[in-house]
Amino acid sequence: MGLATVCEEAKCPNIGDCWGGGGGKETTTTATATADIHSDNGSSSLLSDEEMKEMEHYGTATATIMIMGDTCTRGCSFCAVKTSRKPPPLDITEPQKVAEAVRSWGLDYVVLTSVDRDDLSDQGAGHFRKVVQRLKELSSTASSSLAEDSGGSNCGEETKKKNNKIIVEALTPDFCGELDLVTQVATSGLDVYAHNIETVERLTPRVRDRRAGYTQSLQVLGHVKSVNPDVLTKTSIMLGLGETDDEIRRTMQDLRNNNVDVVTFGQYLQPSRRHLPVKEYVTPEKFEEWRIEAEDKYGFKYCASGPLVRSSYKAGEFFLKNMVRVNKREREALEEEEAATTAAVV
């Protein structure tokens, strides 16, 4: 269908695992996914027993698709995606192509990412919005079809169920900090808005393209919540570039100050000799310490942390496990509250 994947273009280290299915029951196209993760009040929704059984029965079919071409207008020192000042024009049929691919694959969760397109007047925000909306139209149509289906052949039934509630995550550029463009994507109907801050403030000028900025990325993430409080916001940080523990903690606090819900930590791996060298290989134990600290001390709703963790890699598996954990915690808290209320009445 002429669609690009960030897995190939960015030389992701997990491509063999993801494309090979990664084992288990989860069906994986180029990354992974999750169950429904936002509710009307913007908090993590709880998975009902029925939803859990459905997820276990059907598995989670997911994909990460890179839209707006495979050529970026920026040249970050850590990234392997090819660059050009003037990439090819956008494919105006891409929203429909993505929708058709998702329909044929029977996906539950789609991660849309993209190259930067500073060459476009709206930097691709309008195109991003169209792709999200087309996917949500597909989800709505599939849901209606399932509701109208009455008896008869079960042919295609599983695909319908998989398309019944498509969760859409958008991993976006910073749109040069133009918040009206951020608004276009944030209000498109997506479920998760991701934008990667990548590294700590001190290292940003060396790691990211000069048009990117630490404060600019924080403003993007904070603005998303201001225009759509219900959406889940997410970011990713690479470790091993020379950052200090205090700088990581400061970054986590800055993210929470801007209402970011989810953070992921992964090991930076040098794509080629032309890219930044690795300063440190962080141990799995240290990654686990960062996960605990992110969730317990800084209050992130969820943190995925490990050497090979990337923005969308194993997202569904991690989220599903986390939602079960959240379920248990909130049920226990509710039971304690009810017990206290009963005791007070007595």
Label every PLM stretch briefly:
Residues 1-55, 59-61, 106, 130-165, ...:
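Auxiliary Fe-S-binding modules of radical SAM enzymes
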Residues 6-20, 68-83:
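Local cysteine-cluster metal-coordination motifs and their immediate loop/turn environment
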Residues 72, 116-119, 175, 242, ...:
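Short, glycine/serine-rich, charged loops/turns that create anion-binding
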Residues 62-67, 77-142, 146, 161-181, ...:
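Core AdoMet radical
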